[in-house]
Structure formats: C-alpha cells, structure tokens
C-alpha cells in the first residue's frame, strides 16, 4: 500500500506509474501476507500492472500506518524523494541482491542477498558501471575491465566477435516514433513551425504525408545496420493485441507531396525536430535521416539534438511540435502503448500520460476503455486489435521501427536477449 501511495508524489517523472494506481475502491490487508484489491470495474491487467512496480519497505520510511480508504491514500506522511534510494539503508527490498554502494556517475555495487527466498543468484557481487560513450564501452569489454556491455555499436560487431567475444541480440518491444503537436493552434503557438499561419499537424493529410515520406527500410538498413525492424503499429508481432496484417506504411514521397498540396501546403513549411542524442540506439542519426526525408517532400526540417535529460524536460513542457522518442511496453501487450501514447491525456485517470502530442479521438478512447475492462482474453485481444488499427489509420504518431537490442559478452557466460531490453544480473549465468 505504501508503494502505491508514494507513486503520485514522484516529481518530474518522464513516464509516471500513476495509471497503475487508479480505479481502486479499497485496498485491504487482512493479514501480513495478504492484500486484497477492490476495483470499481473489472481489471484484467491488474496483476500485470502491479508486477511492474518495485515494492518499497514502509518500515524504512516510517510509513507503517498508511492505509487506502474510500478517499484513496491516508496517513502517508512525507514520502521519500527518489534520491534517497541511493542509500543502502533506504533501498530495502526482497530481491536476490542488496545495494552495497551507489556512487553517482561511477558505479552501482550489488551484493548477493543471502536471505533471498528463491534460488540464490550465481554472483556474490555485481558492479554496474555507466559508460555512455560507445568507444570506451567497447574498449572496456575488450580490455577485460567489464564482462558484459549493453548496446555495442553495430559497426563494431565484427571486431568484438573477432576478439573472441559474443554478440547476442533480439527484437524488443521498444517502438521508435515521431510525435506531432495536435493541440496548439495557430502556428505562433506551435513551437518551431514556420511558413504557415496554422498548426499543420492538426490535418490528418499532413500527418499521413509525413508517414509516407519516411523510408523505414532505408533507416533500418543504412542507419541501424539491419539491427531493427520497420514498424506498422506500436508493438511487434506476435505480442498480445498485434495484427500480422498491420504492415509499415509504404515509402511514397510523391504521394506525400500530393497530400501536402491537398492540405494547403504545396510549398511545404518549416519545422524543428527535437531528439535526444544519447537515449535510443542511433537516435540522433535516425532523426537526421527522417529530417532529410521530410525536407525532400517540402517540409524543411531542422534537427535540435540534446542530451536525454534536457530533451525529456523540454518535451514534458511541450516545447517541441515534432519530436523523436521511444516507448517500451513493459507489460508486453497492446493496451500499454495505446493508453500511454494515443489515448486522450487525462491526469485524473492516467490515460494518455505520455501523449505529449495531445492527440484525442473519443472513438479510440472508448475502445481502449472497453478493452481495459474486458476479462475474456479473446474478446480483449480483438478490441485491442481494433483500437490499434483505428489509431494507426489516423496517424496520431509515426511509428518508425522496433529496436533490436544487442549485448556483447565475454566467453564463459550466457545471456538471453529480453524483449523489454533489461539487463538482469540474475539472468547472466556461467556457461559456454
């Protein structure tokens, strides 16, 4: 209960978990090992959603008296700030490892939890080192300073394998997409848009033109080195709620120009494309490629690249009318990205919490809500498919590709690529 009560208090969260704390009429704890959730409506995703939350120790923060009544959370007190979890005494959980030391920008050291309730992990100590630059990260692996690295650069695969190391990779549930401002109007209220007196992204024809202008396969092959999959919806097949017939929009620059002309932009317009340059695989390069493709159809596109921390702060303040970002669906089913990215933004319900373009479609919202309260799995999956098809037909955002996530490992250990892109110490194991 303490965990659920704290979630709405977390400041500056780029992707808040508040959507998972809605809809509870009551939460009861009849004994120390039982928790009973009473919801206002059927909630088929409740166990799945709760599994994404890290459970906090109420005792560590003096929150043992907290309760959840008809009015929501009661007796929370002063919840901890995120920075407090950098202290081992506060980072209390029931997992296979314990936090031994955290030094910002240098390392995180975990030690095996000898009192763990499950199988003991293989490693006595695990050290995580943040190495943001690709070159030093690869060099650390080749020198034997580290055993595993995330996201080795594609161009270094041959060098890494030639030195006797392994590459493992697999498709992820992370969609890379372009989002457009579908809220502000006229143009002077639409940041970065020039050459028009209105917001062009409010016109579906403009959004469709942008989609047709993007050569997704060229991005996959030339920018991503084949280590990505072109996207036609928000999750890759065969995850729950996806449709095999939802193919990527075909590259059609002439069709895109025609749509722009029909929308009243025969000479195009100008826009700034915001992007992080250190968050997603080749993010700035992908943004530059997309900008060139849009410029070719008459939308002069200038790229504004920056660190992820700066980008997300500016994005959350709606400073971009067009931006590149990514979304990973932790739940592994279509409800997650539909709720997060294309449902109408509603702080009261948590719907649309990452819909920074503020697209709104009541018909789509109704389908999403119906799917969210449908317990029958087959019926729910069909509703999600309908919602996905409706959304993609209206171009609320432009799906580009799904990341294929690589890891590089030394010989003698194994790791199986995860669709959620997580690197878990418990799943790195000795082996050939």
Label each PLM-derived region with a short phrase.
Residues 17-75:
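Surface-exposed binding/hinge segments that line
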Residues 48-49, 334-336, 410-413:
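Short conserved micro-motifs at the rims of enzyme active sites and ligand-binding pockets
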Residues 61-64, 226-246, 405-410:
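Mature extracytoplasmic/periplasmic domains
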Residues 58-59, 80, 395:
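Extended, small/polar residue-biased N-terminal targeting/export presequences
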Residues 407-432:
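Long beta-strand-rich cores associated with HINT superfamily self-processing modules
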């Amino acid at each position: 209960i303490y965990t659920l009560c704290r979630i709405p208090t977390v400041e500056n969260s780029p992707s808040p978990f508040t959507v998972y704390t809605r809809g509870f009429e009551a939460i009861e704890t009849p004994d120390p090992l039982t928790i009973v959730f009473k919801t206002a409506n059927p909630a088929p995703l409740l166990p799945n959603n709760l599994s994404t939350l890290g459970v906090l120790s109420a005792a560590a923060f003096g929150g043992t008296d907290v309760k959840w009544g008809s009015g929501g959370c009661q007796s929370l007190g002063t919840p901890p700030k995120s920075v407090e979890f950098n202290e081992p005494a506060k980072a209390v959980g029931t997992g296979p490892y314990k936090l031994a030391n955290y030094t910002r920008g240098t390392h995180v050291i975990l030690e095996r939890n000898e009192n763990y309730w499950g199988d003991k992990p293989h490693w006595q100590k695990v050290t995580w080192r943040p190495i943001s630059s690709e070159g030093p990260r690869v060099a650390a692996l080749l020198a034997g300073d580290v055993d595993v690295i995330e996201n080795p650069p594609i161009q270094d695969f041959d060098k890494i394998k030639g030195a006797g190391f392994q590459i493992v990779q697999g498709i992820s549930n992370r969609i890379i997409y372009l989002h457009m401002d579908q809220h502000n109007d006229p143009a002077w209220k639409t940041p970065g848009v020039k050459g028009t007196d209105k917001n062009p992204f409010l016109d579906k024809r403009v959004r469709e033109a942008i989609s047709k202008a993007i050569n997704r396969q060229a991005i996959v092959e030339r920018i991503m080195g084949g280590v990505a999959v072109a996207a036609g919806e928000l999750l890759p097949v065969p995850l729950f709620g996806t449709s095999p017939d939802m193919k990527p929009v075909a590259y059609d620059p002439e069709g895109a120009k025609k749509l722009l002309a029909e929308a009243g932009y025969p000479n195009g317009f100008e826009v700034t494309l915001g992007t992080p340059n250190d968050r997603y695989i080749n993010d700035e390069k992908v943004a530059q490629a997309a900008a060139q493709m849009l410029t070719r159809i008459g939308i002069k596109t200038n790229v504004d690249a920056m660190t992820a921390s700066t980008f997300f702060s500016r994005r959350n303040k709606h400073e971009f009318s067009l931006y590149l970002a990514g979304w990973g669906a932790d739940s592994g089913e279509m409800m997650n990205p539909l709720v997060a990215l294309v449902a109408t933004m509603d702080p009261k319900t948590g719907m649309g919490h990452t819909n920074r373009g503020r697209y709104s479609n009541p018909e789509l919202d109704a389908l999403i809500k119906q799917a969210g309260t449908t317990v029958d799995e087959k019926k729910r999956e069909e509703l999600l498919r309908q919602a996905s098809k409706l959304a993609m037909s209206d171009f609320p955002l432009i799906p580009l590709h799904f990341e294929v996530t690589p890891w590089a490992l030394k010989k003698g250990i194994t790791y199986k690529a995860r669709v959620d892109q997580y690197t878990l110490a418990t799943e790195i194991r000795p082996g050939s």
